[in-house]
Amino acid sequence: MTTIASLVLAYLLGSVPFAVLVSLGMGLADPRSYGSGNPGATNVLRSGNKLAALLTLLGDAAKGWLAVWLAQTYGASFGLAAPEIAMVGLAVFIGHLWPVFLAFRGGKGVATALGVLLAVNPWLALIAAAVWLAVALLTRYSSLAAMVSAVATAVAAWFIEPGVYAGLTIVIALLLVRRHKQNILNLVSGTESRIGGKKKS
C-alpha cells in the first residue's frame, strides 16, 4: 500500500504543469497555443520570455528531483528500497509526460528526467547536461540534444549506477526518445526549429 501511495503521489507531482502555471502567472499565452504546442521550457522560450523559460525548466527539474529525494530520504521508514525508489522516479517522469491536470497531454520530459537523475546520481545529471549542451551548441537543435543526451546517459548509467537505476535511466531514455517522434520526422525533413528560432511550417 505504501508503494502504491508513493507512486500515486509521485505521478501527481509530475503532473504539475509548470510551463502553463508560469506562463499564466506571468501574463503570457498558454504554451500549448503556440510553437510546438508542447508545455515545456523550450516552447516557453519561443514566447520570447527567457525568465519564464528558466522558471519552467527549474520547476520541471525540481519536481523530478523532489519525488526521488523524498523517497530516498524517508522511504526506508516505510519499506521502500532501491526498486521502489526507481519506480517513484519513473512515476514522476510519467506524470510529466501524461499529466492528469492537462488531460494526459504533457511535455517531452527532458527537465524532469534531469531532476530525477540529479537525485539518483549527480554524475548522471552532469553527463546528461554536458552532452545536451554540447549537441545544442553544435546544432542548435534542442530535440536532437535531448535525444543524444538521453541515450548517452543511459549508456553511462550501466557503469555508474548498475542495477535498478540503470534500468530506470534506460526506460526514461526510451520514453523520452519516443516523445520526440515528431521531432525526429522534422529533423529528417529539415523542418525542425532551432533554439532561438521560430517554429518552421
Curated annotation (Swiss-Prot):
Pathway: Lipid metabolism; phospholipid metabolism. InterPro entries: G3P_acylTferase_PlsY. It is an enzyme of class 2 (transferase). Keywords: Cell inner membrane, Cell membrane, Lipid biosynthesis, Lipid metabolism, Membrane, Phospholipid biosynthesis, Phospholipid metabolism, Transferase, Transmembrane, Transmembrane helix. It is a multi-pass membrane protein. One of its GO terms (molecular function) is acyl-phosphate glycerol-3-phosphate acyltransferase activity. The chain crosses the membrane at residues 4-24, 84-104, 116-136, 157-177. One of its GO terms (cellular component) is plasma membrane. It is found in: Cell inner membrane. It catalyses: an acyl phosphate + sn-glycerol 3-phosphate = a 1-acyl-sn-glycero-3-phosphate + phosphate. GO terms for biological process: phospholipid biosynthetic process. Disulfide bonds: none annotated. Its EC number is 2.3.1.275. PANTHER family: GLYCEROL-3-PHOSPHATE ACYLTRANSFERASE-RELATED, INNER MEMBRANE PROTEIN YGIH. Probably interacts with PlsX. Belongs to the PlsY family. This is Glycerol-3-phosphate acyltransferase. It comes from Laribacter hongkongensis (strain HLHK9).
